[in-house]
Structure formats: C-alpha cells, structure tokens
A protein has these predicted regions:
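Residue-level signal for alpha-helix termini/capping positions
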Residues: 52-56, 187, 200
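Right-handed parallel beta-helix/beta-spiral solenoid domain characteristic of secreted/periplasmic
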Residues: 29, 71-79, 89-142, 161
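Right-handed parallel beta-helix
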Residues: 92, 96-97, 124-135, 153-166, ...
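Glycine-rich beta-solenoid repeat tracts in large extracellular/virion proteins
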Residues: 77, 84-88, 103-105, 117-122, ...
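Right-handed parallel beta-helix/beta-solenoid
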Residues: 1-49, 68-69, 300
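Acidic glycine-/aspartate-rich tracts in secreted/extracellular proteins
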Residues: 26-32, 67-70, 99-102, 218, ...
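Beta-strand-rich, repetitive solenoid scaffolds
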Residues: 3-4, 44, 53, 97, ...
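Glycine-rich repeat segments that build the extracellular carbohydrate-interaction surface of secreted
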Residues: 21-27, 45-78, 93-100
Length: 310
C-alpha cells in the first residue's frame, strides 16, 4: 500500500484530483480566456487566473515559467516578468518558480509609490518558492502573510529559495502568522527591512527562520529581522551583514530585534560586528533581545557572543 512514506519521499499527492497548472506570460499560446492552465503548452497568462482554479486542501500546484527579465539578462525574448499583485485565499496551494538556477522567476510589484504587495497570503499551508521580487513599481512588499480579521489566517506558510532586492521596501511581513518557515532566501539591501512584524499588528510566533542571507537591509532603517513583540520563534544559521556595524558605526537594532517578545531561541547566526562592549555597531547595538530569550553561540567578527544582547 502506498501511504504517507511514499507521499513524503516522492512528493506525490494522495488526492487523485490534484491540479498542476502552468503560468507563462512569455508563451505564445498563453491566455486566461479558454485555457485551463493544466497543459504546459497552453498555460495561463497570469498567476491570478491559476489561483482562481485552485481548491482548498487538494494540493494544487502552480508552476510559473522562467523569464529573462533580470537587469543583465542577455536574451531578446522571454523577457516579460510576472507583474501582478495577487491574494492567496486557497489553503494548501503551492506556487513554484521554475528557474533552474539564478535568483528565481522575476516578479515585479505594480502599484506605485511603494504601496504594492506582490503576494498577500490569507490562507493556511501555502508554499512559495523560487521567485525574485524586484523591479517594476519600486518599493512595496514581496510577501505579506496575515489574518484577515475574521476567519482567514496566513499561518503555516513556507517561503524558500526566494530573492528580495533593493527595489523592495519589505521582503516578507508577518501579521498574526504562526508556524511559518522562511529558509534559503536572500535579502539584498531591502530598503526598510528583510523580515518584519509591525509592532502595531498581532505578533508572529512559533516561526522558523534559518539559512537566509541579509545584506545591508534597512541601512539606517529597521534592519534584517524585526520581530519586536514576537515570541517562541527559532532563528538560526542566518548571515547578516551590516556595513555600518562592520565599520564600527552605529547600527541600532538593524540586525535581529526580538525586544518585547519572549522565549525566542536565536543561535548560530553570523553578524558583521564586534562583540559586546565596544560601543557603536557592536553586538549589543546591532541586536536587541527579550529578557526571556535564549541567544546561544552567535558568531561575530571577534569570536562568539554567548549572551543575550543588552
């Protein structure tokens, strides 16, 4: 009998009617009018059209075709990026960019003045993988998972192998989003913050954030990971470079900030700063902790930091 082990090993769905759908705005036969999206030679034009055909908890998957829309892309064809702002309300859906390498399938926000969000998640158990959020109407947010205030929760989300560049103000924002996992992502100079929970929102708890790169996110702004007021998160094995801290300049709370929360475990992260006791730009300046957190063996330029940042 093929059961759970087969499903976990080979990624096969136990739901016989799982829909596999394809989106590719660069394909000559792509259209949202008449195609079902289930034939890769007759894909949808937009992600929104594919989402409209998804069903709760059936394991539906949307594959988004690669494009050559990067600034230095060498081709003259297939250069149309995904340029949409979509809201996911289907539980258990996966959206996967199919770039075989590089930064991911390029996805641009479209709302001007930094007000757009590429993907809003109002559903549980969503997987997002393989996208590069950049370009388009600069600013805005790459992914925002949140409770809708009623019955739809952006919980249990997985984001992996995505890229967020300096065109984005916020990489990923969580609001009352628990049990999410963010891994293998690259946050390159996001203007305001890499991963964020606004103190005016409900806390983001029980999340797992690991093996990500943050390079000068929120320089002079919020920072790499701002989880003020959030609790019981595990944050480990992240690489955080801050140019001001590296040079001995002030970088207050621009690393990891869990102040006001509690019971977070933060360990084995790498910071471009000196250990505590130096002053501007040191471990205590770059980071903030709750008194009930456990910060364990984090790496700084002068060795190991073995206490909670003050």
């Amino acid at each position: 009998m093929l059961g759970i082990n087969y499903t976990a090993t080979f990624g096969k769905s136990m739901m016989s009617d799982r829909r596999l759908m394809y989106v590719n705005p660069n394909h000559g036969d792509a259209t949202d009018n008449g195609n079902t999206g289930e034939n890769p030679e007759q894909p949808f034009l937009t992600v929104a059209a594919a989402l409209a055909r998804t069903r709760d908890n059936r394991g539906d998957v949307i594959f988004v075709g690669q494009n050559d829309a990067w600034t230095y892309g060498g081709g003259s064809t297939w250069q149309t990026a995904i340029a949409e702002e979509v809201t996911i309300t289907t539980e258990g859906v996966s959206i996967i960019g199919t770039n075989p390498g590089g930064l991911g399938v390029y996805w641009n926000p479209v709302t001007a003045a930094g007000a757009g969000t590429c993907i809003t998640v109002h559903a549980m158990d969503v997987l997002i993988s393989g996208f590069a959020f950049e370009g388009g109407a600069e600013g805005g947010t790459g992914i925002y998972a949140l409770w809708d205030g009623a019955t739809m929760f952006g919980e249990n989300m997985i984001v992996r192998d995505c890229y967020f560049d300096s065109d984005m103000d916020i990489g990923i924002q969580l609001n009352f989003s628990w049990n999410c996992e963010i891994s293998g992502c690259n946050f390159q100079e996001c203007d305001s913050v890499g991963i964020y929970c606004d103190t005016a929102d409900s806390g983001a708890d029980y999340n797992r954030i690991h093996h990500n790169i943050f390079h000068d996110c929120g320089a002079g702004g919020i920072g790499a990971i701002s989880f003020q007021g959030c609790s019981e998160n595990h944050i480990w094995a992240n690489s955080i470079f801050n140019g001001s801290a590296q040079g001995g300049g002030a970088a207050t709370d621009e690393g990891i900030d869990t102040a006001g929360g509690g019971d977070n475990q933060v360990f084995d992260n790498y910071f471009s700063c000196a250990n505590a006791g130096v002053g501007a730009g040191d471990y205590d300046d770059l980071n903030s902790a709750s008194g009930t957190d456990a910060w364990i063996a984090n790496h700084v330029m002068t060795g190991l930091a073995i206490t909670n940042p003050a």
